[in-house]
Amino acid sequence: MEASRGPPRVKNKAPAPVQISAEQLLREAVDRQEPSLQAPTQRFADLEELHEYQGRKRKEFEDYVRRNRINMNNWMRYAAWELEQKEFRRARSIFERALDVDSTSVPLWIRYIESEMRNRNINHARNLLDRAVTILPRVDKLWYKYVYMEETLGNIPGTRQVFERWMSWEPDEGAWSAYIKLEKRYNEFERARAIFQRFTIVHPEPRNWIKWARFEEEYGTSDLVREVYGLAVETLGEDFMDEKLFIAYARFETKLKEYERARAIYKYALDRLPRSKSITLHKAYTTFEKQFGDREGVENVILAKRRVQYEEQLKENLRNYDVWFDFARLEEQSGDPERVRDVYERAIAQIPPSQEKRHWRRYIYLWIFYALWEEMEAKDIDRARQVYTECLKLIPHKKFTFAKVWLMKAQFEVRQLNLQAARKTLGQAIGMCPKDKLFRGYIDLERQLFEFVRCRTLYEKQIEWNPSNSQSWIQYAELERGLDDTERARAIYELGIDQPTLDMPELVWKAYIDFEDDEGEYERERQLYERLLQKTDHVKVWINYARFEINVPDEEEEEEEEERPISDEAKRRARAVFERAHRVFKEKELKEERVELLNAWRAFEHTHGSPEDIDKIEKQMPRRVKKRRKLDDDRYEEYMDYVFPADDQSAANLSKLLRMAHQWKQETAGGQQ
């Protein structure tokens, strides 16, 4: 019972010695198939028996066509049977009856015509074909049958007449090609040429013009080929141009080694066809230039290809200024001034839609590059000046301006040795839309011209317009210092540090201190540090103050040129500054600043101090400890804090004092009891 359950198991899984393929199985199945039944051959003993059989078959066929008149297969089987019986008149009658039912049945016409041709009834077949093409003039199969029969019979004029009747209906391209092939077979090239002329009028597709040109190339002259291509270009116009036509034309000229003609054809086509319709043309032109052109020709091909590419990108977005930059550089490389101007003029016409400066930043460089090209490359000074002028007119200066354009216009006038125009330009800029960059550019110009009085005037106007600009005060003072007018420089610094709205006052203070240091006015410098410390307790100020004190020479050292070691007085002054700073930070509990100060103090002692001084400062260095503090949401967080030994000692002394006071109070109370 257990062994009978489940699928049978294969004990021997090795392959059989004889393998049977699917092909072998199919072959055996076909070989063993039983033969189909065949109808017995009928034999008629006499004519009466034949007539009886024919009558019976005709009755069957008549019943078939009567029951289903529109089924042409019944009619055609009936007519075919009559043809087998050599009853041609009856067969014609059946075909005519069928045509009365459906005169548009092409298979019926074909069967009728072929039966007449098979029995060599040529005139009957010709009449049938004439009737058929008259009733169904758009059925090419009937026309092909007609011309084939006439040509087979050697009736070439009749064949031409049939073709002419057919061509009057303006059939498909295949019919015209068949007519042309007929004339070519009989060497009637003039007739074929005339047919091509009519053919290209009815079907003016470029491929048909190419067929005509190849015909002329084979049987005509090169002038006729050029005439065909020229007529094709003129007929098609720019709307229906095709790259294949120009490629074929150029290759024909290349065969004749007319390389300049071929190049002109390629360029003509590339200038007129859009990029999407001339990809293959570009490849063909590139290949042509590589084979037959020079280096300049190959570069022109690449330029033309990129030119079309940029045009396609600009069709998608005319305000893509990056594409305009690339396009302009491309034309500048080509060396055609008119093309360069055309691209720049088209580019600057794409004004940003909004009056927001971020939209104008890229656009304004088109004007700048245009003006520079006119000046440097085209050498057209008047046109460059006009470009700058038009650009400045276009910018909405009441909302924003571009100092770069004003400055470049002024520098352009300087290069033309027209200083008055340059000053007028910058003066107009400062009057319309003052900016720090404009002032700096104007001042740099006057400084290069050694017009220091004008520089002073400009600095005064800049400070009057924007007194919060620290750099303006510093540069003004440096100008006066460069002119050896230290009193004016010092007065400017004094005015600068007194300004309450400075954007970066620390720069002015530092410049003032460095100025006094360079002048050797150490007492003034010390006073400046003291005044600065009244305004701020920044740790860097204290550290720089201490470094200043260590570097200040004594009166005897000032007179000597040789360097001497740092005096004890200088070290004492520096330590005094460090100690003052340490007290300030300790009182204000500024731990981070205190640590930074102690690090600088320790570095100072390691460099200039004694071992006792170093040990003293090391004892003051803090240690980092981890502490916890409570947050607003009753949670705790850990943080790193600094613990200073001096603070611990003070706390310990205070704790000891309190403990002694408490003990004394207890003793006093016990004695009274």
Swiss-Prot record:
Q: What InterPro entries is this protein classified in?
A: HAT, HAT_Syf1-like_N, HAT_Syf1_CNRKL1_C, Syf1-like, TPR-like_helical_dom_sf
List the Gene3D superfamilies.
Tetratricopeptide repeat domain
Q: Does the keyword Nucleus apply?
A: yes
One GO CC annotation, please? Answer: U2-type catalytic step 2 spliceosome
Source species, domain of life: Eukaryota
What the entry lists under SUPFAM superfamilies is as follows:
TPR-like (SSF48452)
Compartments where located: Nucleus
Q: Where are the HAT repeats?
A: 52-84, 86-118, 120-152, 154-185, 187-218, 220-255, 257-291, 301-333, 335-369, 379-415, 417-448, 450-482, 484-518, 520-551, 569-607
Question: What Pfam families does the database record attribute to this sequence?
Answer: HAT_Syf1_CNRKL1_C, HAT_Syf1_CNRKL1_N
Q: Name one GO biological process term.
A: spliceosomal complex assembly
List the keywords (alphabetical).
Answer: mRNA processing, mRNA splicing, Nucleus, Repeat, Spliceosome
**Repeat: is it a keyword of this entry?**
yes
Per the record, the major location class is: nucleus
Q: What does this protein do?
A: Involved in pre-mRNA splicing and cell cycle progression. Required for the spliceosome assembly and initiation of the DNA replication.
PANTHER family reported for this sequence: CROOKED NECK-LIKE PROTEIN 1 (PTHR11246:SF3), PRE-MRNA SPLICING FACTOR (PTHR11246)
Family statement: Belongs to the crooked-neck family.
Quaternary structure annotation from Swiss-Prot or TrEMBL:
Associated with the spliceosome.
Protein known as: Pre-mRNA-splicing factor clf1
Q: Name the species this protein comes from.
A: Emericella nidulans (strain FGSC A4 / ATCC 38163 / CBS 112.46 / NRRL 194 / M139) (Aspergillus nidulans)
